[in-house]
Amino acid sequence: MVSSDTGECFSGATVRVPADLADALKQQALEQGFALAGIAAVPSGERIAMRTAALQRWLAAGHQADMAWMQDPRRQAIELLLPGVQSVLAVALNYYVDQQQTPASPKIARYGWGRDYHRVMDQRLRRLGRWLEEQQPSCRWRACVDSAPLMDKAWAEEAGLGWIGKNGNLISPSHGSWLLLGHLLTTASLPADQPARSLCGHCQRCLPACPTAAITEPFVVDSRRCIAFHTIENRDEQVPLPLHGWVAGCDVCQEVCPWNQHHAQSSADPAVQPREWILSSTVNEMASWSDDTWSERLQASALRRIKPWMWRRNLADLG
């Protein structure tokens, strides 16, 4: 291994024909539990350049709020993440489960209902990297979940998994946008899939549905107005806007999307099944948690990014 999330391929296995290897790699991804898998080539086409320019405009406008890591230069130059990268395997984990929280429960975004997806996806991507080691000698790879400085939605779009919608989420025609994205960068040269094309059409349901008007125009989300940002990332003692019942994240712009209303598929993956307390706990119950209870309830959860004092802050806003 090169580092904690990279690998070098020194297997003496027979080199496969690139097209066969690409198909086999994507099949392996599906067998690991990913709902979608596709491959993009590096250097990329005009679309990645367009998405990079859009990111630069977004940053220049200050829409990242205080998320300084969004300015990491590696996000705009994939070669800095893995020198010599030629291909990107993009994968998507379907996290939608056809269950609902009780009306009395503080609202928690669905991505946080199950186990920490960073760990789940990283483990599965590493297995794919090790499998790739066995197939092609002398290649290098790096696994990336959304904590890596990568334009994950742009590369997933380039690999054909879906298109970036007007709410900023990647939308798949087969699954909607209830998807978590991961990538395996590799120096192996693999044939690319056809990039996805947008199917949003004239629909703009997500824009007026946002309770804080965070989607300032199609495809532009201002984090300074976003409930998800303020509940998860804002470290101030008070949040500057109403949370509208949300204590962790926000799913409104996804809930109103027709692609989710008509194409969401309930996942049976054990990693994304909801914890019982998420579905049924009340504001008063959550507000009474000690730090130890918080640690127990959120063990191996992506919601641990919301510290205990932030959790109480968010709950206090709900009254």
From Swiss-Prot:
Gene3D superfamilies: 3.30.70.20. GO terms for cellular component: cytoplasm. SUPFAM superfamilies: 4Fe-4S ferredoxins (SSF54862). It comes from the Bacteria. GO terms for biological process: queuosine biosynthetic process; tRNA modification. The keyword Endoplasmic reticulum does not apply. The active site is at 146 (proton donor). It catalyses: epoxyqueuosine(34) in tRNA + AH2 = queuosine(34) in tRNA + A + H2O. It is found in: Cytoplasm. [4Fe-4S] cluster 2 binds at residues 210, 226, 250, 253. Keywords: 4Fe-4S, Cytoplasm, Iron, Iron-sulfur, Metal-binding, Oxidoreductase, Queuosine biosynthesis, tRNA processing. [4Fe-4S] cluster 1 binds at residues 200, 203, 206, 257. Residues 188-220 form the 4Fe-4S ferredoxin-type domain. InterPro entries: 4Fe4S_Fe-S-bd (IPR017896), 4Fe4S_Fe_S_CS (IPR017900), QueG (IPR004453), QueG_DUF1730 (IPR013542). Pathway: tRNA modification; tRNA-queuosine biosynthesis. Its cofactor is cob(II)alamin; [4Fe-4S] cluster. It is an enzyme of class 1 (oxidoreductase). Binds 2 [4Fe-4S] clusters per monomer. GO terms for molecular function: 4 iron, 4 sulfur cluster binding; epoxyqueuosine reductase activity; metal ion binding. Its EC number is 1.17.99.6. Monomer. NCBIfam families: tRNA epoxyqueuosine(34) reductase QueG. Catalyzes the conversion of epoxyqueuosine (oQ) to queuosine (Q), which is a hypermodified base found in the wobble positions of tRNA(Asp), tRNA(Asn), tRNA(His) and tRNA(Tyr). Belongs to the QueG family. This is Epoxyqueuosine reductase. It comes from Synechococcus sp. (strain RCC307). The gene is queG.
